[in-house]
A protein has these predicted regions:
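A short acidic, Gly/Pro-enriched loop at the edge of an enzyme's catalytic core
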Residues: 93-105
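Conserved catalytic/acceptor-binding region of the Class I
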Residues: 119, 126, 134-204
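Short glycine-centered segments of the SAM/dcSAM-binding site in methyltransferase folds
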Residues: 38, 133-134
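A short SAM/SAH-binding and catalytic strip from SAM-dependent methyltransferases
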Residues: 104-118, 141
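Conserved class I S-adenosyl-L-methionine
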Residues: 1-37, 48, 52, 72, ...
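Helix-to-beta-strand junctions that scaffold the AdoMet/dcAdoMet cofactor pocket
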Residues: 115-116, 129-131
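Class I SAM-dependent methyltransferase SAM/SAH-binding core
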Residues: 38-42, 46-95, 120
Length: 207
């Protein structure tokens, strides 16, 4: 089995994602979504971003490597009555079965950043997005003193073994030079790439 798939299927990510729904909703509101729009949510989890996209009228396909998260996403979509939203299993590094230029927008919020081959991820995101379409990523920023996640990882690193040789930290997706290099190799000119720093809050005690 793909070790990345095994890792994500082992955890209880749906419980963690419940505290992150606000981030997906706030990001989606900022994108000016107007139907008809076909969107791919890559590394979608159980629908943190895909569900608010579909509620705004977009046709959304969510792809995640973990089958349990795909099942949870389809369950949430059915319960919400969102018949233009589907979830399916897939690998962000190799989107087999997804045709070139299939989507008006490809989005990934705290998802594809965890795939082990970032240059392949960038290439695939560009490949499946229509010319003139948009690619949107939400990624954590390393060494940010205001970031809960950054500080949590810094603390945990002191108590865990070093990563294996060749490991590429997902936090590198929060570094401007890496983003430009990865999408540049996928054919996106530097002047077409822009970055915005923002802060989203975890929901605590339903507040």
């Amino acid at each position: 089995m793909n070790p990345n798939k095994a890792l994500w299927e082992k955890g209880a990510f749906t419980e963690i994602a419940a505290f992150m729904h606000q981030s997906g909703e706030e990001l989606v509101k900022s994108l000016g979504i107007k139907p008809p729009l076909r969107v791919l949510d890559l590394g979608c989890g159980d629908g943190t971003t895909a569900i608010p996209l579909a509620r705004l009228g977009a046709e959304v396909v969510g792809i995640d490597i973990a089958q349990n998260l795909v099942d949870a996403g389809n369950k949430r979509a059915t319960e919400a009555g969102l018949n233009r939203l589907t979830f399916q299993e897939g690998d962000a590094c190799n989107l087999q079965g997804v045709n070139n230029h299939s989507f008006d927008m490809t989005i990934s919020v705290f998802g594809a950043m965890f795939a082990p081959k970032p240059f392949d991820v960038a290439r695939e995101m560009v490949r499946v997005t229509k010319p003139g379409g948009r690619i949107v990523m939400g990624n954590w920023i390393p060494n940010d003193p205001t970031s809960f996640v950054s500080q949590l990882l810094k603390i945990s690193a002191a108590f865990t073994p070093p990563p294996p040789e060749g490991f590429i930290s997902p936090m590198t997706w929060g570094v401007e030079s890496h983003i430009i290099e990865r999408f540049g190799q996928a054919g996106v000119p530097k002047e077409k790439i822009s970055m915005v720093k923002d802060t989203y809050s975890f929901i605590s005690n339903n507040k």
